[in-house]
Amino acid sequence: GNFSGFETMHYRSYGESQNYMRLPEIFMPTEFLHGLYDGGHGAGLYDYWEMMRKHPRCIGGFLWVLADEGVKRVDMDGFIDNQGNFGADGIVGPHHEKEGSYYTIKQLWSPVQILNTSIDKQFDGKFSIENRYDYLNLNTCRFLWKQVKFPLATDASLSLIHI
């Protein structure tokens, strides 16, 4: 709906969202992705977020839902019943354990973005960085990184990892 110049409709498609951002109202969908429909938010977030960041009328949006939902069954030794996959749609699990979407969202919404998409043999140790903070200069931040080489499946020295 439209509330005092804010367009807040839930779950507009990607194309509809682009159209709404061209209207005079400020675009802030109160829910624009639902974890149930993409396995927990991470799958569709990048495209939506990049579109929203580029439109001056968009001021953000909300994801549904933070934590997996379910009923703790006393008749099943505390098993959390969410009727299959109907409540397992959160950014974190039912005990607030971090799930895959948590890390995706953390990376996509980080105010410091590493723009290098790949590191090749000519890599000189320098990264291109984008500052998405509104009021903070990156000279006040400290960055640590480590370059590692993971073994390839074809490496002769590859050994089994025992878990």
Role assignments for model-derived ranges:
Residues 16-17, 48-50, 115-116, 131-134:
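Generic recognition of flexible, low-complexity loop/linker segments
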Residues 86-124:
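Non-catalytic, glycine-rich low-complexity segments
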Residues 161-163:
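Conserved small/polar residues in nucleotide/adenosyl-binding loops
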Residues 1-100:
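Substrate-binding/catalytic cleft of secreted carbohydrate-active enzymes
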Residues 30, 64, 117, 130-132, ...:
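Generic beta-strand/beta-sheet core signal
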Residues 61, 105, 129:
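Conserved, mostly hydrophobic/aromatic
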Residues 35, 54, 111, 132-135:
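Short, well-ordered loop/turn and helix-capping segments at boundaries between secondary-structure elements
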Residues 124-159:
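Beta-strand-rich binding/interaction modules
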